[in-house]
């Protein structure tokens, strides 16, 4: 079991020292002996947050498409957000899951089931099939608010345990808040980027919770990135999905297994921004793009006649349809030729193998 105090006191330069420097001595002189100091309150809040973190182990179903990129077996982290055992994690861990286990901080496992996967935000929800141990169940974290976060603010990220791996606690700083477009047909407007990067041992950074100094949950770990600052100078770090995106859809996710925004056209392409153009890196086997004749190396120039030069404009134009299975015309450069390729998009959520619980 990881030692919270040993970890936190070794990292006081990020949070505790600045906090102490901001407190006048009179604040401590006037406090009653039994009244907790601001530092003690912060330590208690972060200790509660740390205790709510769990590990997650997933085995994907046989024949799962997602196994090609995510693997058949996946490890990650999650955090308890509900009295009924509801755990929040990053959704790609749960894609086409056949078996899910929660790993407690004393390295015991509890079987779990997927509750939701939200394609639009990337969040995933799960619940244990058996009661969680009391030392975890009594520690539930509140959702914070990232609107007031400022670059440079000290934060705490925690990775969940795995067998033979106790997880880790890392102090990090917010580097930037900005829009993020993923290569896998994904875009959010307000991703959180932190540095230095948190521990990557065993892949536990996937789903790792990010906490503010009040012990409130503000983000869920998605990726390791080489450019956390977004500037020319490379600064390795992590991208977290902000919980601000969860709050308005949490009830819908629990009821329907996803938000309505997840029902959108999917092409089955992995693409990247390449100096003012959108280049296809790969196409999913059997997906709409492959069936229509798109190939790796193609450059997407327009969607339905509207020029696109970034992943963001590409995705938003594709998603601007009333039906997820709409016909879409792509203008692409394929080698030395410019072609118009018509494809029939799919509802990504209908292509995934799902356990009976969703």
Identify the residue ranges that each predicted region occupies.
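Bacterial N-terminal signal peptides
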Residues: 10-23
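N-terminal activation segment of mature serine protease catalytic domains
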Residues: 27-92, 99, 150-157, 251-252, ...
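Terminal peptide-recognition signature
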Residues: 51-56, 78, 85, 89, ...
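Active-site region of chymotrypsin-like
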Residues: 52, 60, 71, 129-142, ...
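Conserved active-site neighborhood of the chymotrypsin/trypsin-like protease fold
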Residues: 61-62, 80-165, 200-204, 276, ...
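PDZ/PDZ-like groove recognition
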Residues: 193, 197-200, 252-317, 333, ...
């Amino acid at each position: 079991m990881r030692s919270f105090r040993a970890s936190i006191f070794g990292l006081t330069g990020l949070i505790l020292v600045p906090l102490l420097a901001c407190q006048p001595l009179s604040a401590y002189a006037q406090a009653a002996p039994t009244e907790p100091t601001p530092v003690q309150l912060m330590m208690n809040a972060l200790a509660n947050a740390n205790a709510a973190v769990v590990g997650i182990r997933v085995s994907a179903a046989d024949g799962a498409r997602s196994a090609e990129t995510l693997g058949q077996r996946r490890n990650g982290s999650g955090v308890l957000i509900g009295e009924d055992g509801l755990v929040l994690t990053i959704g790609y861990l749960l894609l086409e899951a056949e078996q899910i286990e929660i790993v407690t901080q004393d390295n015991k496992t509890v079987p779990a089931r997927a509750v939701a996967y939200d394609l639009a935000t990337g969040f995933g929800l799960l619940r244990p099939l058996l009661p969680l141990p009391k030392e975890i169940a009594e520690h539930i974290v509140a959702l914070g608010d990232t609107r007031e976060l400022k670059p440079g603010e000290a934060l705490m990220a925690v990775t969940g345990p795995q067998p033979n791996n106790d997880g880790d606690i890392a102090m990090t700083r917010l580097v930037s808040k900005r829009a993020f477009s993923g290569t896998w047909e994904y875009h959010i407007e307000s991703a959180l980027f932190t540095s230095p990067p948190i521990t990557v041992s065993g892949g536990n950074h996937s789903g790792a919770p990010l906490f503010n100094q009040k012990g409130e949950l503000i983000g869920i770990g998605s990726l390791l990135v080489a450019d956390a600052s977004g500037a020319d100078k490379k600064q390795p770090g992590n991208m977290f999905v902000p919980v601000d995106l969860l709050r308005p859809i949490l009830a819908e996710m629990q009821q329907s297994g996803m938000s309505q925004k997840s029902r959108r056209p999917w092409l089955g392409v992995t693409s990247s921004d390449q100096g003012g153009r959108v280049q296809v890196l790969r196409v999913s086997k059997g997906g709409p793009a492959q069936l229509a004749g798109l190939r790796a190396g193609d450059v997407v120039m327009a969607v339905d006649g509207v020029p696109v030069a970034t992943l963001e404009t590409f995705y938003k134009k594709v998603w601007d349809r009333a039906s997820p299975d709409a016909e879409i015309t792509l203008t692409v450069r394929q080698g030395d030729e410019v072609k118009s390729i018509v494809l029939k998009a799919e509802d990504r959520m209908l292509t995934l193998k799902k356990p009976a619980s969703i």
